[in-house]
Amino acid sequence: MQMDLRFCLKSEVFCLVVSKGVVKMRKIIVLEHVSLDGVIQSPGGQDEDVSEGFTYGGWTGPFASDELGRLIRTQMHSDFALLLGRKTYEQWGDYWPHHADVWPEAQIATKYVASQTLHESLWEPTVFLTDPIKQLKLLKLEAGPDFHVWGSSGLAHALFQNDLVDECWLIIYPIIIGSGKRLFPNGEMNPITFTSMAHHLMPNGVIVSHYQRK
């Protein structure tokens, strides 16, 4: 079968176009628990991330609900590859292999880890990315599931700065933390426009919002 092939350029990433449709590119989807002032550090536990003297770990706990849990599980139980920074990978590698019954999809998913120093796998299957921005531009062109980024603040910043994020799935909590690692620190990026795809408002004020890159 003869195909008419050409290339189109978007966000410095080439996507293959064929005469009968566009080959689907893998998406990078950032999923974050975020406070009103943009903090994403240590949402789940007191000692999850105490770097830089952060003492407010576990700040999402008071807002837990069955409805929120159900929405989070829709992402946890989908088809994905994990894309993580080194610290998040090390934390999750110590925890999730021992709780495979809770999140079996994470056990079989390929874990892509942005790190120039970590070379020993803690959680198979794992692929280390020593030049993550360059490598991800190529990986997005390959067949496979979308990439899910949880936590991994430094990696998330780099992905936004390089306009590689295709979707955001933000869980916004009605709390101001005042300090800690933020999703968008110091305005160190160019403007990027997203379209609101869906949002869910919980009775306790938590908002789950889904955005897609225009």
Where are these regions (language model features)?
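Enzymes that bind and transform nitrogen-containing heteroaromatic metabolites
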Residues: 12, 19-214
